[in-house]
Curated annotation (Swiss-Prot):
Keywords: Activator, DNA-binding, Isopeptide bond, Nucleus, Proto-oncogene, Repressor, Transcription, Transcription regulation, Tumor suppressor, Ubl conjugation. GO terms for biological process: cell development; inner ear development; lens development in camera-type eye; lens fiber cell differentiation; megakaryocyte differentiation; negative regulation of transcription by RNA polymerase II; positive regulation of gene expression; positive regulation of transcription by RNA polymerase II. Residues 284-309 are annotated as: Basic motif. There is a cross-link at residues 29, 33, 327 (Glycyl lysine isopeptide (Lys-Gly) (interchain with G-Cter in SUMO2)). Residues 126-369 are annotated as: Represses ARE-mediated transcription. It comes from the Eukaryota. This is Transcription factor Maf. Residues 72-82, 196-211 have a biased composition (Low complexity). The keyword Transcription regulation applies. InterPro entries: bZIP (IPR004827), bZIP_Maf (IPR004826), bZIP_sf (IPR046347), Maf_TF_N (IPR013592), TF_DNA-bd_sf (IPR008917), Transcription_factor_Maf_fam (IPR024874). The gene is Maf. Acts as a transcriptional activator or repressor. When overexpressed, represses anti-oxidant response element (ARE)-mediated transcription. Involved either as an oncogene or as a tumor suppressor, depending on the cell context. Binds to the ARE sites of detoxifying enzyme gene promoters. Involved in embryonic lens fiber cell development. Recruits the transcriptional coactivators CREBBP and/or EP300 to crystallin promoters leading to up-regulation of crystallin gene during lens fiber cell differentiation. Activates the expression of IL4 in T-helper 2 (Th2) cells. GO terms for cellular component: cytoplasm; nucleus; RNA polymerase II transcription regulator complex.
Amino acid sequence: MASELAMNNSDLPTSPLAMEYVNDFDLMKFEVKKEPVETDRIISQCGRLIAGGSLSSTPMSTPCSSVPPSPSFSAPSPASGSEQKAHLEDYYWMTGYPQQLNPEALGFSPEDAVEALISNSHQLQGGFDGYARGAQQLAAAAGAGAGASLGGSGEEMGPAAAVVSAVIAAAAAQSGGAPHYHHHHHHATGHHHHPTAGAPGAAGSASASASGAGGAGGGGPASAGGGGGGGGGGTAGAGGALHPHHAAGGLHFDDRFSDEQLVTMSVRELNRQLRGVSKEEVIRLKQKRRTLKNRGYAQSCRFKRVQQRHVLESEKNQLLQQVDHLKQEISRLVRERDAYKEKYEKLVSSGFRENCSSSDNPSSPEFFM
């Protein structure tokens, strides 16, 4: 270290006042980079955080704007030590601003995260233990409803991001960080869209509220995944409870058309009226229309048969009357015939006697007849 300080004597100030100020400090304790290297590292770190979209949009003090300049009295330390301290400084700034950073945007290795956890205070370690127990209880309570969502988010998050989220959770618990209102707003919106959810929806909402509370305390992606899983359960329950409303809407739509309208309406007009209706409702209405048409056809056939029977019966009555009239005519003609026959017989018998009496007189006219 002495040789490095000797090599950098040209960088030290020459004024007596500055030398007295420098002598008040133990220069052997300073193992930091030079100002240009530190500035480049801070700028690159800020660019990576801004590109990841993890900084807050509110006008607050950020790590990049409030970083104090590093003194340039000593030479840069070896590469391994500088990288390790750079990671530790990143964790220092990250724990100072838990509500502005996104742990998934930081590309740290698990070893660096473990070292950062070890270097933190015992209070932060206790916060991490509480967060781990809360995460285990949340995972056990979520069960089958949010298990898939938690598993998927855990796989996407990775071990490094999980440890980073634990550090942020402990810092947020220590400093009383702001809760994540995004999850609660999401669940409230879900309840607004599905106000008629039954028991499954209520269970999903309860799990979603528990997951949202875990997200407010932890602030990590695992809590966010649990909240998403609970919200999905509530949505599924609400969707299952909406089927009676669809059925009620179908009954109301059935009242829209009377039986006469369904029968008299053409197929094209009916299809135009049924646009936007579910397939089951269309099939049911068309089946009802077919049943009504068949019933009407059967009734018309029955009416025609009855009408034809009445016509045939009336014609039969007319024919019977005509037969009776003809019978009466026949009986009258028979009586006339009998009368004429008797008269003829009388005339014949009387004429034969006259012929016998006048046969001797050939000059009589009856003789030549």
